[in-house]
């Protein structure tokens, strides 16, 4: 299976411990896919600053192909700053600077590379909703809508929901009725599977309205950064054995079971100290 993770890369900076880690939805997904044995590629714009070199090093050391990423001269990497206490993060600020690389612009060259994928994973954090027509490619397409309400409006759904096989959302704990209501506008737009991760409350998956629910295997988490990204990979690994656009409740149930511990306590990559 060849996976291409399409979109963002950042540096996650832990202000109170002065540690930094490569991150971003697409970077995390690519690394976790490689660790599961997939042929993994990251496709996104890279800067040429020291932070970009940290991201590149982490991806390459984890076996992720970055050979098709455009490197933008004189551009910088976004830094997301957090405080982390007892494994739980609290957001502080985003530092983009005046020369941030910005979203990837898909050209014919990138499109040709995307055609080689069995699975494409992207997210709202890629900041490229107008380019999500890449869903028309033969690959299975998964999209992470994150946790913010601005990515759950009818207008946003209309822009990005072209042919999504799996939609992922980070949510507060909810019951099945509330989850069904959350899924309805996505299913109406042709999304086959909708996965909600709810932290310690577990996960729910809707397969064209049929809901599968799983609890969480509790562990002592050392770090929750990237937990949702790692959670989706077991499901996708199973689902990719199924034809694009087809419902498969068994694949979803198996994937959710695998998710119970996969995303907890997973620290992507340590790079030492970062002084800002």
Could you describe each region identified by the protein language model?
Residues 1-4, 58-60, 66-70, 85-212, ...:
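Ribokinase/PfkB-type carbohydrate-kinase core domain
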Residues 2-3, 11-79, 85-86, 270:
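Substrate-binding N-lobe of the ribokinase-like
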Residues 5-8, 261:
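N-terminal targeting/anchoring "stem" of glycan-biosynthesis enzymes
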Residues 8, 12, 144, 223, ...:
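Acidic active-site catalytic centers that drive phospho-/nucleotidyl reactions
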Residues 9, 47, 126, 173, ...:
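Glycine-rich beta-alpha junction loops
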Residues 10-13, 148, 219-220, 242:
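A short, flexible beta-alpha/helix-coil linker loop
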Residues 20-24, 50, 76, 151, ...:
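Residues at secondary-structure transition points
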Residues 180-276:
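Conserved phosphate-binding/catalytic region of the ribokinase-like
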